[in-house]
Amino acid sequence: MTSQIQDLLATDQDLLLMQEGTMMRKVRTKSWKKLRYFRLQNDGMTVWHGSQPESMPKPTFSISDVERIRKGQDSELLRYLVEEFPLEQGFTVVFHGRRPNLDLVANSVEEAQIWMRGLQLLVDLVASMDHQEQMDQMLNEWFQQADRNQDGRMSFREAQRLLLLMNVEMDEEYAFSLFQEADVTQSDDLGSEEFVQFYKALTKRTEIEEIFEDFSSDKQKLTLLEFVDFLRKEQKEKDHAPDLALELIDRYEPSENGRLLHVLSKDGFLKYLCSKDGNIFNSDCLPIYQDMTQPLSHYYINSSHNTYLVGDQLCGQSSVEGYIRALKRGCRCVEVDTWDGPDGEPVVYHGHTLTSRILFKDVLATLAQYAFQSSDYPLILSLENHCTWEQQRTMAHHLTEILGEQLLRNTLEGLLVDSMPSPEQLRGKILVKGKKLRTIEVDKEEEEEEEEEELEKDEGPDLDPASPELDTQPQPETQGQAAGNKKERKKKVMKCPMSCLLICGHVMAQAPSSIPESILLSKQFLLLSSTTIMCPDLSALVVYLRTVPFCSFTHSKENYHIYDISSFSESKAKNLIKEAGNEFVQHNARQLCRVYPSGLRTDSSNFNPQEHWNVGCQMVAMNMQTAGSAMDICDGLFRQNGGSGYVLKPEFLRDTQSSFNPERPISLYKAQILVVQVISGQQLPKVDKTKETTVVDPLVKVELYGVPEDTKEQETSHVENNGINPYWGETFYFRLQVPELAMLRFVVKDYSRKSRNNFIGQYTLPWTCMKQGYRHVSLLSRDGTSLNPASIFVYTCMQEDLDMDEP
C-alpha cells in the first residue's frame, strides 16, 4: 500500500474504528433489512462483511469502486423507512457506473458519521492518486491476495496462484526462473520489494524498448533533440515539440540528473507513454474548449429517455436515482412523464404499465439539488404532461417553488425571439420543454400574423370517417382574396384543429367548473393536440422550447419558429434520414429536434445515436440505465468539452443552407485514411473473477462509426492464455469520407470457440479528440467505469491524399 494510506490507517481514529468492525443494517428494499458485520480490511482499500464478527467474511466493495458517500437524508429508500430508522443514522455508498447503491443504517449517529467520514477520506485519497501510486496500490492488493498464510512473504506456489489471479498462464520452468531472479536474498520466497521486481520482469515492455532504441543513439537515453524528433515524427506534435519535450522530461524523468541534463531514460519514456500525456484522448479536449455562445440548435445535447426508470419499460422501478445517475453522467435533457396522483399530487411513471410511481415534487427536489453538480450549462426538462387541470396547477406551483431562481420563466433580457439563446447565456438555468397555449409574443403585429396562420389551419374539413386523406398543403390564394377574407375569418366560430376533433366532447366534459368559459372557448385552449387540458400557469413556464407536431420539413420551415421543437421515434427519424437527409440537416440547423427509442424496446435497450447525429439531431434520447455499444458511443461523444453535455456540431451541420447529406456525402476534402496498429495489451481483467484458474484469450476489435460509408470494423487474431501482456502487432486501414463525424471504438474480448466472445473492456472517442502516434487506450467496463490499469497500446495516424483501394 502507499505510505499515505499506511500513515492514515495507523493514525486516523475513524479508520482505526472501521478496522475493528461495526454491526450495521444492510437495506435492500422496504422489507429486506438485515444486520451485517462490516469491517475495513488492513489494506485500507477493501470493505468486507459477514453475518457475525466471527463468521467467514466476504468482500463487499473496493474503495476504488466508490464514487461518493451520501447522507441518509438523500436516500430515497431510507426516507421511506424514516419511521423505523432515524435518517441521521443512515448513509449510502454510491458506486461508479450502474452498480446499485448500498444503503446502510448504523446503530447510532456517531457510528454513521465515523463510517461516512472514513469512507469519504479513502475515496478522496484514491481519486488523488497518480498512475504510479495506483500501480503501487494494485501490486499491494495482488501481494495480499497471493500471500495466503499472511506471513508477508510469497512462496513460488503462491506466485503461481498470483499469475492466475493476474490473468496469465505461463510455463512453470520460465515462471520459476523469473522467481529466482527476483529472489535476491535466496530465501526461496519473495518480500514485497522483491515481488515488485518479479512483477516488472513479468510485465517487461519490450515493444516500448524497441521504439525507444529506434530514436536513441546510445540505446540508454533520449537526448533532447532525439526526443523532439520522436515527438515530431511519431506523435505528430509538430511546431511546439521542443517546448513540449522539455515539459515532459521535467514531468516524467525519475532521475534528477536526467532532468538537469534534459535527457529521458527508458523508465521516463515508459512513464510518459503510460501517463495522461500518452493517452489517445487529447487532453486539450477535456476542459471546455468549444465556443459556447452559439444558438442551442448548434449543439449535440446529452439526453435521457424515461429518465425516472432504472429498469425495463414495463415493470421496472421508477426512482429519483435515475435522475441523479443521468445528471452525474453529464445529461442535459431529462424526461418527466406526469400523471394524476393521489391526494392531488402529480406522480411520475411510465403510463399504462406496471412501473412504480414517484412524486413529481420529489423529482423536482432532486433536480434542484443535482442539476448543476456535473455541468453548469442549461438543463432541459422534457415534460410529457398527462395531468388534469388541477394537478397541472400543482405542477406549475412545484416548478416555481422548488426550482426557484433556477427555473427560466422569461425570455432573456434584450434577446430577440428570432434568435435562440446560447448555452453560455443560459448557464445555471432549467428550461421546461413542453406544449404551450400560445407562442412567444414579440409585438402586436406578429401576434396577429400568428392568429391568421392558426385560423387557416383550423379551417379543416368536417369530421367524416370516410373522408379521403387530407391535403395539408396550403391552397393558393390571391393577395386580394386574402385581404378580403381576413375580417370574415375573424367573425367565424373557431373550430377545433384536426387533431382535436375526436376529443372535443371529452375535453369539455372533464373541464373543471372553475375554468372560465372564456378560456374553454379560447383559441389557445382549443389548439391542444391531445386530450389534456392545458393549464395557463403551466403553459407560461414553457419559454423557448415549445413542443409541436411534425408534418413535413416544408411545413416546419414555413410555419414553425426557431424555438419550436418536434420529437421523432427512432424509426421515423431513420426513414426521414434515408428519404430527405439534406432537408433534415437544414431543419436541425434551424431548430431543435428530439429522437427517442422505439416503444418496442421494452427491455430499455438502445439504438445507435450516430446515424441521428449525422443529420444534426441535437437531443438523441438514450436509456441511460442500459449498458452497451450505443451508450459507449454516447458517452464517448460527450466525454469532451468539460463533460458539459453540450458538443458543438460540425460547421456543415450548423448551416441552414448546407448541402450535406450523410447518405450521399460529398467531402470538402479528399478522403483520409486512418491507420490503426493494435500493438499490445496490459493487465486485462478476467471475465469471470470467480474462476481463478481461467485465463483470457484476448482479441481487439476496432470499430468506426460515422456516415454509412465510414461505418466499418476490423479485429485482430486472439492471443492464447495471456491477459497481462498480450501482443498483437496488427495494422488496419479505414477510409474516412467525413472524419468530423467519426467515432472510434476499441473493444477487447475474450475469444471463445464454443460461444460468443465475452466482453472484457472498451473505450470510445471522437476522431476529433484522437491523438496520433503511440498511445495507450485506457479501458472501461461495460458500465463505463475505469478498469485501471487495464489498457491497450496502439499507434494511430492519418494519411491524407492517399489513393488506395478499400481494405
Swiss-Prot record:
Where does the PI-PLC X-box domain lie?
290-435
Tell me the ranges covered by the PH domain, including all copies: 16-124
Residues annotated as binding Ca(2+) 4 are 697, 721
Q: Which residues form the PI-PLC Y-box domain?
A: 538-654
Annotated region Disordered: the residues are 442-490
Domain called EF-hand: residue spans? 134-169, 170-205, 203-237
Could you say which cofactors this protein requires?
Ca(2+)
Keyword field: Calcium, Cytoplasm, Endoplasmic reticulum, Hydrolase, Lipid degradation, Lipid metabolism, Membrane, Metal-binding, Nucleus, Repeat, Transducer
Provide the binding site for Ca(2+) 2.
183, 187, 189, 194
State the species of origin.
Mus musculus (Mouse)
Using the UniProt record, name the top-level EC class of this enzyme in a single word: hydrolase
Record's protein name: 1-phosphatidylinositol 4,5-bisphosphate phosphodiesterase delta-4
For binding substrate, which residues are annotated in this chain's numbering? 433, 435, 567, 594
